[in-house]
């Protein structure tokens, strides 16, 4: 018999898996790489109502991930419960069609504790701060600790308990870039939260990203956050969008066609503040620019979709990176028509401004040269025609 034959021996009996093994299996879906762990921990902090998050990593998150927040915190009673699989405070009515938080499955913390060395220190308004540790699935006793209101979660030696996973990780540089991209996306989704990302590799402390808290989540605040995270060029070459159809609101900033990119790396989609990489949304954005941009170029955009929780199912992917809308064609239509309209309006405005400026310049030139000969007049006419045919978005 081939050694890879998958036939089950009659001697094997069905048995219940150990809780530690279950958590390790779950970790394979929840935590693919250090950036996945960072995402889960930051989302927990945001769900806890924090206004400031500091993320510290070392060696691309392989040896250290530490997330510090000023959220509600957990009591000494909640700490051990939070480490149980499928224990959560985010489904009060057990309704998966009415999710108003990032997390809801109760899988992140037990999964992280199963594959790494996890330490949680938390302080709420109750009886002070407490600490609990998990090493490869083994939970320690709770003990008193010191810290202000909020939670600190420290994950060391990710995948030490499942060493086979380590060889699938990329270089430290690549893993750090993935973490940086994750933090950028989450910071764009929640402009009313301050973010600081620090690389502590080699015992040093290098600040990679720092953005201050914006006053709200308005379009103006979103633009400020985008400018700080993506740069002034994006801000200067983008236009705002704010359209509503029935119970769905589409807001954000989309680039001018002249600001085309070589890849789709600068495309951000948020559904009820949750960042997603959904093929349907990516395709809709592509379709919106099909008349303005070559196929080998990509638009830059930050698109926020707000809708009722029961209008979208976020429980269709282990990493929650994909969603399923009740009316997918309606969402696509809203994106395509909404973006095309704002681009057309901006193009008309730019064209009118350009034509007015060109006409003024030509009149000034004619006024200064009253005796222009026929050759000069012909030249001026050609210049005027060229100006009119200029790109709308320059």
Question: Where are the language model's segments positioned?
Answer:
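N-terminal phosphate-binding caps/lids of nucleotide- and nucleic-acid-binding domains
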Residues: 1-392
């Amino acid at each position: 018999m081939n050694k890879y034959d998958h036939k089950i021996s009659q001697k094997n009996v069905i048995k219940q898996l150990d809780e530690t093994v279950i958590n390790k299996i779950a970790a394979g879906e929840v935590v693919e790489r250090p950036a996945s762990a960072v995402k889960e921990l930051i989302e927990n902090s945001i769900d806890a109502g924090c206004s400031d998050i500091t993320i510290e990593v070392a060696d691309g998150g392989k040896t250290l991930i530490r997330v510090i927040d000023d959220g509600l915190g957990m009591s000494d009673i909640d700490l051990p419960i939070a480490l149980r699989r499928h224990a959560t405070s985010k489904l009060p009515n057990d309704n998966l069609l009415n999710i108003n938080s990032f997390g809801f499955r109760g899988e992140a913390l037990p999964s992280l504790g199963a594959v790494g060395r996890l330490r949680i220190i938390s302080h709420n308004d109750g009886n002070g701060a407490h600490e609990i540790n998990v090493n490869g699935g083994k939970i320690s006793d709770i003990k008193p600790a010191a810290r202000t209101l909020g939670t600190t979660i420290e994950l060391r030696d990710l995948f030490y308990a499942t060493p086979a996973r380590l060889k699938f990780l990329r270089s430290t540089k690549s893993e750090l870039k993935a973490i940086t991209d994750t933090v950028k996306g989450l910071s764009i989704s929640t402009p009313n939260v301050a973010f600081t990302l620090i690389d502590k590799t080699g015992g040093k402390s290098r600040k990679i990203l720092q953005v201050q808290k914006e006053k709200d989540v308005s379009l103006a605040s979103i633009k400020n956050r985008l400018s700080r995270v993506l740069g002034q060029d994006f801000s200067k070459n983008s236009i705002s969008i704010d359209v509503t159809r029935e119970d769905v609101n589409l807001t954000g900033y989309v680039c001018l066609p002249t600001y085309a990119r070589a890849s789709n790396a600068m495309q951000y989609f948020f559904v009820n503040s949750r960042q997603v990489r959904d093929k349907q949304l990516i395709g809709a954005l592509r379709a919106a620019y099909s008349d303005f941009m070559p196929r080998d170029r990509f638009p830059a955009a930050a698109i926020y979709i707000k809708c009722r929780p029961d209008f979208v199912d976020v429980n269709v992917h282990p990493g929650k990176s994909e969603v399923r809308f009740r009316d997918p064609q309606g969402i696509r239509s809203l994106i395509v028509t909404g973006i095309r309209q704002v681009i057309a309006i901006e193009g008309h405005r730019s064209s009118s401004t350009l034509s007015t400026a060109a006409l003024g310049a030509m009149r000034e030139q004619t006024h200064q040269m009253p005796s222009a000969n026929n050759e000069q007049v012909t030249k001026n006419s050609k210049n005027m025609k060229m100006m009119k045919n200029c790109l709308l978005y320059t």
